């Protein structure tokens, strides 16, 4: 749907106006309760990982119904981005089911797998934690040496030149550039200069993500980038800036989303529906090519 990027972004400023509290209490929560009942979604604690195709279909239908009614709330403009069923179907129809990533000896197929598919999964390895500057390069090298690795989402930096990284601060820029250059250097040192990256996790802000886009020393066109949904079913201008830049620079965009069990989604039933709806949000709002899910419980 990248070819309709600006049409979708326009809705972040022209959609229906609504205060955030009303969006949550008058639209999102009531609609979630409605679709749980309508589609008879019921969690069985004795069977936490069901193999019920009918249940899976109903969760999907509930998520579509929920997303089309609720949309996505922009916290900066207080506007609700809404989409039609026809637009959603078009986006799903047009979405490729696989992409070629990396290059040369490290080119791989990053693609869809069916339920019970015997095809080998695409493996992105990541420690997903911060490292001290002195160990960062070595940590990247250690992961890149893994033979099963198809792509890397590298460690994060918590400090730069001994200073804590602060979002939207020059120190964040310095740390993110250091992260990007060290990751590229690590890939060269192990003989995998063209391996697929999902980067740069150290860059929290939109301006830092834009700053590390560089074919020579930073994140390249064709690499993966991440943009988060805001819990629940929300976004803001900074997230939209990231999503827009990723498409313009030629990167694969991944949507990060984590429905909170016991929060606005409710219990297991609502969490499953909400997490499925985030796939639709990623596709329509961020024009994302892949999804990373992390539903969680705060207790």
Where does each model-flagged region fall?
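Metallocofactor- and cofactor-centric catalytic cores in central/energy metabolism, strongly enriched
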Residues: 1-213, 228-237
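Glycine-rich anion/phosphate-binding loop at the beta-strand->alpha-helix junction
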Residues: 202-203, 212-299
């Amino acid at each position: 749907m990248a070819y309709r990027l600006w049409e979708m972004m326009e809705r972040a400023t022209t959609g229906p106006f609504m205060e955030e509290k009303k969006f949550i209490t008058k639209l999102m929560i009531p609609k979630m309760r409605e679709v749980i009942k309508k589609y008879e979604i019921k969690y069985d604690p004795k069977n936490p990982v069901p193999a019920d195709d009918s249940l899976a279909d109903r969760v999907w239908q509930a998520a579509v119904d929920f997303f089309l009614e609720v949309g996505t709330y922009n916290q900066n403009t207080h506007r609700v981005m809404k989409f039609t069923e026809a637009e959603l179907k078009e986006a799903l129809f047009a979405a490729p089911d696989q992409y070629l990533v990396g290059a040369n000896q490290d080119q791989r197929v990053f693609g869809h797998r069916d339920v019970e598919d015997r095809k080998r999964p695409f493996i992105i390895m990541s420690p997903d934690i911060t490292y001290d500057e002195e160990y960062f390069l070595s940590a990247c090298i250690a992961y890149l040496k893994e033979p099963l690795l198809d792509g890397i989402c590298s460690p994060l930096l918590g400090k730069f030149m001994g200073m804590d990284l602060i979002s939207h601060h020059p120190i964040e820029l310095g740390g993110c550039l250091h992260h990007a250059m060290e990751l590229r250097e690590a890939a060269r040192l192990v003989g995998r200069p063209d391996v697929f990256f999902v980067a740069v996790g150290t860059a929290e802000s939109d301006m830092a993500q834009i700053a590390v886009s560089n074919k020579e020393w930073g994140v390249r066109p064709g690499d993966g980038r991440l943009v988060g949904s805001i819990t629940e079913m929300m976004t803001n201008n900074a997230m939209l800036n990231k999503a827009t830049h990723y498409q313009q620079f030629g990167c694969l965009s991944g949507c990060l989303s984590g429905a909170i069990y016991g929060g606005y989604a409710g219990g297991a039933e609502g969490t499953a529906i909400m997490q499925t709806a985030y796939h639709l949000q990623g596709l329509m709002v961020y024009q994302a090519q892949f999804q990373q899910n992390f539903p969680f419980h705060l207790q």
